[in-house]
Amino acid sequence: MERFRIKPYGFGELAQMYSPAHNYDSALQHFREEMHLTRGMWAAMVAEGYKENTKILTRAQVRTIVKFLGEP
């Protein structure tokens, strides 16, 4: 298996990496819920420029996600 790389990802692409057993829409919903429910994560993402309608996650945002959730 290829090692996870910190790079820009589509929001849905990364959501499916974290929830591979879910369909696309469920993975998106679960990923958003995790961002809100994980203490400090939402504020950290907003500080990195994340908005609710963000489609492409920057390297910095991906790094923040991995900091809070670990690698997918």
Language-model segments: residues:
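Membrane-targeting and insertion segments and their boundary/processing signals
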Residues: 1-5, 9, 32-39
